[in-house]
């Protein structure tokens, strides 16, 4: 009997159980000298937390970075911590609500010559003699972190990235219209201190708020502004664990047309296998 008990204890100590883990970043106000307009990305955090909890995420496993907490360094550290804690078969959800910007592609993997980037709290809108884009979080850098995460969770795990930002869609912004995320001004580099990464095959889903050339408008509810993509996901929270990503993107587009009543086409990137699965 003691022998069986010992074997049982050894076996049970090696078992790991899949968890649902999330990182939610919301920026409404940027550093005073950054040049960025205030938006309401920080309002999205509570919606995302409620949405995730409705889909089995424990609040203890939902890390958040809000406004001045969401510096480039803190975001990178949070991604690293998420990777360190991730286990095989885990479900990973990463959500960014804030400004986005196109930045010069330094490793020449983009056809148009520009990387997409998330704009952390401390990233200026323009280059200068002392700033060369090192605090813009490019898609190459994010993909590097996601590749590490993908290795940790394995083929049965899930990784979903939501970008409620806009990288190039404000070229049609009307004078005085501030309810839009992102900028049409590209961040042009002649030199950079950023590391270069080799493009990796993507084993994750990336859902963004709109196509290039479209505006990502915020949605106003009871006098409070939210990201339109975030709010659409919140309204569809009961279907996030049951509908495939392909089915979900159609539902999201329908919701966006109702919410903002302007052309806004959400984009879904990832492998075909990921698109056929649920996002959570």
Locate each region found by the language model.
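Cysteine endopeptidase catalytic domains of the caspase/legumain-like
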Residues: 14-280
């Amino acid at each position: 009997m003691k022998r069986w008990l010992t074997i049982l204890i050894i076996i049970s100590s090696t078992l790991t159980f899949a968890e649902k883990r999330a990182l939610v970043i919301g920026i409404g106000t940027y550093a005073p000298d950054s040049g960025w307009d205030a938006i309401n990305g920080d309002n999205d955090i509570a919606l995302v937390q409620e949405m995730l909890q409705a889909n089995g995420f424990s609040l203890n496993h939902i890390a958040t970075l809000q406004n001045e907490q969401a510096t480039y360094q803190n975001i990178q550290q949070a991604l690293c911590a998420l990777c360190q804690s991730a286990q095989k078969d885990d479900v990973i959800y990463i959500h960014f609500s804030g400004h986005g910007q196109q930045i010069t592609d330094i490793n020449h993997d983009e056809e148009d010559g520009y990387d997409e980037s998330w704009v952390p709290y401390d990233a200026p809108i323009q280059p200068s003699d002392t700033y060369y884009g090192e605090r813009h979080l490019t898609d190459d850098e994010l993909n590097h972190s996601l590749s590490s995460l993908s290795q940790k969770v394995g083929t049965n795990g899930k990784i979903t990235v939501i970008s409620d930002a806009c990288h190039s869609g404000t070229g049609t912004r009307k004078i005085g219209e501030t309810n839009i995320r992102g900028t049409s001004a590209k961040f042009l580099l002649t030199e950079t201190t950023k590391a270069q990464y080799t493009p990796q095959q993507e084993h994750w889903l990336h859902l963004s708020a709109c196509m290039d050339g479209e505006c990502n408008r915020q949605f106003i509810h009871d006098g409070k502004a939210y990201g339109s993509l975030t709010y659409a996901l919140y309204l569809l929270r009961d279907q996030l664990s049951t509908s495939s990503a392909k089915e979900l993107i159609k539902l999201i587009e329908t919701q966006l047309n109702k919410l903002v009543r302007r052309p806004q086409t959400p984009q879904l990137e990832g492998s075909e296998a990921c698109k056929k699965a649920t996002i959570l």
